């Protein structure tokens, strides 16, 4: 997916600040779970998932440009009550940042983590990395 840079993402060193990349990853994740055309609302993921942790690795700096960045997103590590989203962010076709987010489904009424439903696992398997079948 394409993610635009914002002028305010730039820091005093004239490149995109490191914290902005978590926002770009969030944009890709929201698109996958909420806005993606293949999402037919068969899962409860839209009703509650929370971030348990992030990992991010910066491969090269990114300077502000009107051309949007390209973010690839996929899923791995589907477990009973958690899964991981992975990201690769490209600037002008060059890999600039990689990252991952551990996500946990939550029952907000009980304020507790919950297990993934079979339907949610089917949905997540659509975006599973080929080497990580669940």
Residue ranges with predicted function:
Residues 1-70, 76-134:
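Terminal targeting signals and extreme-terminal segments of soluble enzymes
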